[in-house]
Amino acid sequence: GITGNRDKILKQFSGGKNSILLGASSFWEGIDLPESALELLIITRLPFDSPDEIMNRAHNKLLQQQGKNPFYHSELPKATMRLRQGIGRLLRTEDDHGVAVVLDPRLQTRRYGKTTLSSLPPDLPINSKKTAELISITQKFLQNGKEGKVN
């Protein structure tokens, strides 16, 4: 594997073929991987901030003092925006194509999941699939390129 700062890792990733990049939160913002540099994006969990970070605790306490629910007024909107940004890395231009897989079951099991999904671009096909089915569909899409269809 390659270690180092984000820019070094991105440079190595961009120069490789059939590369896999495992990235943490620093890869959610400010990167541009055009065309076929990024075709498969796997998001393991929704990008919520840690509620234990001191700034989040202070902000959440302030919201509570104002009678607001910190989750719905702050945490969920930020996570939804980051999810949109992450998927946006996959589809930067009309010529880009790819598959975004979100493994976090909360999109299906929590009330806020439907709202989060509805915030994604309206022309983005969204499907809920079992793992075996997902692997097959993703392989077909990547083999067929832009013309691949996900059902």
What are the roles of these predicted feature ranges?
Residues G1-N151:
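ASCE RecA-like P-loop NTPase motor cores
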